[in-house]
Amino acid sequence: MFALTCDPSKVTRQDLGVDQMPTEMPASTGDAKMLHTWRKHPDLHQWFTDLYFRKEGLTGSITQAEMGPAFNAGQFVRITEHDLDQLEAAVEAGALPKAAGFFWGVSTPEDKKDDLAFIRKARKALKKGLVVFYSSWW
């Protein structure tokens, strides 16, 4: 799980193939800089998965990965200030959606501090005019 930043002029929308959904993303890996990483935080990943599905007008969930679309391995979701407001409210309230998966581990109360640190970094990046994306490989 990771968040990247890039210059808005380096954003493209790509169709990743028949088994993947189109996604907005940095034009190349050289155009992006790592902003934040997480490990074994399935609840946060579920929150970003739900955000991606809403933004793309899709239905499904991560638990339906074998039956329908999944948010994994190449899709990116662009994060706005409004998204960060919603995420911050969910983190502060302990209201991230619960999720579990093979090798995912579990989210812990200690993740809250790290999530809030990410939100602060993402807000700074947006204020600098950068684009912020979330993605993951699982």
Question: Which sequence ranges carry the predicted segments?
Answer:
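Acidic (Asp/Glu-rich) sequence patches and key acidic residues
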Residues: 1-138
